[in-house]
Amino acid sequence: MLSFKSLLAAAVVASSALASASNQVALYWGQNGAGGQERLAQYCQEADVDIILLSFLNLFPDPLNVNFANQCGNTFESGLLHCSQIGADIKTCQSLGKTVLLSLGGGVGDYGFSDVASATKFADTLWNKFGAGEDPERPFDDAVVDGFDFDIEHGGATGYPELATALRGKFAKDTSKNYFLSAAPQCPYPDASLGDLLSKVPLDFAFIQFYNNYCSINGQFNYDTWSKFADSAPNKNIKLFVGVPATSNIAGYVDTSKLSSAIEEIKCDSHFAGVSLWDASGAWLNTDEKGENFVVQVKNVLNQNACVAPSSSATTQSTTTTSSAVTQSTTTTSAAITQSATTTSAAVATKSNQIVTSSSSSSSSIFYGNSTTESSTGIATGTVLPTGSNENAATTGSGSNTKLAISTVTDVQKTVITITSCSEHKCVATPVTTGVVVVTDIDTVYTTYCPLTNSQVYVSVKTVVCTEETCVPSPTSTSQKPKASTTIKGVEKGQTTSYPVVGTTEGVKKIVTTSAQTVGSSTKYVTIELTSTITPVTYPTSVASNGTNTTVPVFTFEGGAAVANSLNSVWFTVPFLLAAFAF
């Protein structure tokens, strides 16, 4: 088995050919999401396409099968689809300089591993049927794909790191070409199905789905979170793609103007590589006034937002100044932060479980495990001084005098958590707005209440400072001021969240949280009293509408049908022709 260093070296070599480009377009093909899907070779004739992802190998490990909607119907004796035309087109695409990856998983399919051993063994199957190995039943005949993409959206996370590692070992045996590994996580970080794979195996690309979730481009776009992950990823050179829908009837779609604004903010990130599109059929139908398809439009956006590197002298000066400031700040505050960790964790776990489940509800919703704060509805700042200190010592911020002051900041924020809301056997990912109260500095307490109130929340913070058995109360009240966006840790996956039915009301809830911290001879007690009037939850605008689009957005993960109320939908997701007769 290859060592981790060998795997990393292989990943770096494989991605070197594409590493310098930040204007690449990756295109998912195979699911006929918008109808009228043409054969693969036609899309590869488009010069602006750089990477093709064949979607999907959606049944594995046993039974094993692929699904390319209207593009493959012949089978081997075993029932495995035999797609000779696609095999010929793969070689055509590769001759035109396209990278062709086979994507595993998708939103519709039956796949996953019960144990690590079966996942590791499955690498042999993939290599022999789609790679440079040998097998009597090869769906693409003698065509060899350039690697594999993991678009795992259900079925658990077991075995995927081991499978990817085993595939890297297979790649090392064939030096005739470069091979690639990629993943297509949904934008909430970390991804429930692909988190382990991304954190344990050096991958070349991540095609992040910035749609169907609260973190889409027209929502709380969290590319920065993924860039920070990439900084510490097993492959430090991993390239990130911003995944967007190619047609306006899919939730999270943005036009080229909004896409350009988003790219403008991230274009100089060292990990940014381009945009991935779902899917090919839709991209060719989505034309502008010039008749250019969406792939060309996106490539133009990327070319127009090329990063211009600053001069070397200016960069050096800025780096030196920043380093000095950060070092000084860390030295002053690190001791206080370390001391508060244990107390905070206990308070969060207890209060979160008690409050989130207290509201009445007509349905139970499962929280995905990620939350991000929006603009704050209120923030107030107060300073409490230990006995014997003076105001100047607390506010100068220099030398050892700063350590004597205990600063209390109360922050009333709005937070969006994503839950799965189910009704009549239909489930959608739904962002729900909740409230969060934060008291920071020595102590940090997160108290989440659901749903958000329809008016301002009053928070009373009572601080008591004790020195040599003498205690002096020092109350602090909040005012309502805006606060920039931040990210906080969400509730653990599996937490059940309830919320009232629209049209109902509830009474007043009071939440009291107390924590204490001792610094030297001083002990500070902080009590939060939150009075919240619970009001009906409105259906989130990101779910109820799709911007200016008058059609109801279709909530579909990759592999799901993208056109609603159409008999053609069956052909988008069902590989067997007999299924159509049910309609």
Swiss-Prot record:
Lipid attachment in record (GPI-anchor amidated glycine): 560
One of the protein's GO biological processes: filamentous growth
Localization, UniProt: Secreted, Cell wall; Membrane
GO cellular component: cell surface; extracellular region; fungal biofilm matrix; fungal-type cell wall; side of membrane; yeast-form cell wall
Enzyme class: hydrolase
Catalysed reactions, as listed in the record: Random endo-hydrolysis of N-acetyl-beta-D-glucosaminide (1->4)-beta-linkages in chitin and chitodextrins
Signal peptide feature range: 1-19
A molecular function (GO) term: chitin binding
Induction: Expression is positively regulated by BCR1 and FKH2. Transcription is greater during growth of the yeast form as compared to the mycelial form, and down-regulated by micafungin treatment.
Deleted gene: phenotype: Leads to the clumping or clusterings of cells from early exponential phase, and to increased hyphal growth on solid media.
Family annotation (Pfam families): Flocculin_t3 (PF13928), Glyco_hydro_18 (PF00704)
Entry keyword set: Carbohydrate metabolism, Cell wall, Chitin degradation, Chitin-binding, Glycoprotein, Glycosidase, GPI-anchor, Hydrolase, Lipoprotein, Membrane, Polysaccharide degradation, Secreted, Signal
GH18 domain span: 23-305
PANTHER family attached to this UniProt entry: ENDOCHITINASE (PTHR45708:SF49)
Family note: Belongs to the glycosyl hydrolase 18 family. Chitinase class III subfamily.
Name of the protein this chain belongs to: Chitinase 2
Record organism: Candida albicans (strain SC5314 / ATCC MYA-2876) (Yeast)
Upper lineage: Eukaryota, Fungi, Dikarya, Ascomycota, Saccharomycotina
Gene that produces this protein: CHT2
